């Protein structure tokens, strides 16, 4: 199964991408862009945005987010998708 996460989920819990067991996680590109806009804020939302971006960037170093990057042992993969590739 795949779960599509939105901006609110990621900002509420920066570790949300690791919370769905062996299921795959999809983050639409526009959600990643929205999170990126908040990173300069000095608020909790800004702190959460920076944390989300750090986690995704660390995963990106392991492979292509378009092809899916494993999130860890007994976890699914993370995909960042353009809206037309959401399936």
Positions of PLM-derived features:
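Active-site-proximal, substrate-binding regions of enzyme catalytic domains
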Residues: 1-87
């Amino acid at each position: 199964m795949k779960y599509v996460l939105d901006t609110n989920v990621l900002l509420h819990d920066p570790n949300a991408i690791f919370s769905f067991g062996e299921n795959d996680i999809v983050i639409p590109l526009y959600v990643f862009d929205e999170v990126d806009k908040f990173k300069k804020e000095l608020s909790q939302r800004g702190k959460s945005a920076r944390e989300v971006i750090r986690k995704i960037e660390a995963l990106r170093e392991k492979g292509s987010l378009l092809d899916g990057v494993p999130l860890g042992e007994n976890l699914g993969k993370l995909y960042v998708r353009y809206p037309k590739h959401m399936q």
